[in-house]
């Protein structure tokens, strides 16, 4: 399978408008994989002898886990991207390098995303959680449902105050504290600016003959085949993504991030066997009195999707219209030939019908797209109102994301049936 993956972005003040950290990710997965958006409340775990079942393996549970909102492939436990109640956001990317990829079942990168969000109230603490779990349990296993697809992982971790890039190769890793703007794609990208690292990372590279111990250590050059001297002038999605961020430096808003995620010429908005199956943008105000706001599509094709807002408040209403059906627990690739169950959630089903209408009828397609953009404009106006005023109607906010999902479904239903 061709090694295509995702793109994750972050921009920090002064690159942004309004003293806000802006996070964004496109999840590029197999074209027919359904991604759901779910909410998991905070929890206290008194029985710590009871282990936590992740996608393939069990890990030790912790006394307390935080509330999280996750965008995830519906067949697994972890998540492609998400946020927690403390404003921590994480997205991961598939990466490949010199180290052979382990197919032995361990923690998936997507499991590590969820575990980091559930267990950490700052970005750097999430980094600590992930590298500790990586050391204890390792990473590996099949990352697709019904097909062989394995990789190592890089992570972009952000909160209200800072952001980190964490890149891995097996159990070895390097981390970079972000300044200004930064993005990751499906390649290693940390070079000589290394702020934290695995204690044996350099020795291992030297033992393998990847570094002579004399030249300045370059993580990407040592652990991958990338020519880092040409990395920022190549036609790669990584390079194109950075150019899009840099183009808007000083004026980046959440709308800017949505525009970047919708960019087709760069390949960031992916089409083909690997498709942008879901997208996320988060607004993390540095003022702690203001809420963090997280926007999810829960549908593929961001240029034909609506970003809908989620805000953490007590007593969140269930996200029923973006929750996939639940099936009997089974190993994703245990049965051969493997037949995928129908994991489409209600929004996904109506969105697929609308996409067909957009493709087949120019007039109806324009009507649907116009209404979608109008709905998203209302989203943007509501977000700005909340961030400018600081006022949050909690009774309304418990239904904020579910209501916008219902409004989106109504657009599709009214035009499909007419």
From Swiss-Prot:
Deletion phenotype: C57BL/6NJ males exhibit impaired thermal nociceptive sensitivity in a TLR4-dependent inflammatory pain model. No effect is seen in C57BL/6NJ females which is consistent with sex-dependent differences in response to TLR4 activation reported in this strain.
GO molecular function, one term: cysteine-type exopeptidase activity
Residues where Glyoxylic acid (Cys) is found: 6
Entry keywords, A to Z: Pyruvate
Domain of life: Eukaryota
InterPro entries found in the cross-reference section: Peptidase_C69
Propeptide, residue positions: 1-5
One GO term of the biological process aspect: proteolysis
Catalytic site: 6
Modification sites for Pyruvic acid (Cys): 6
Family in the record: Belongs to the peptidase C69 family. Secernin subfamily.
Function: Plays a role in thermal nociception.
PANTHER family per UniProt: SECERNIN, SECERNIN-3
Listed name of the protein: Secernin-3
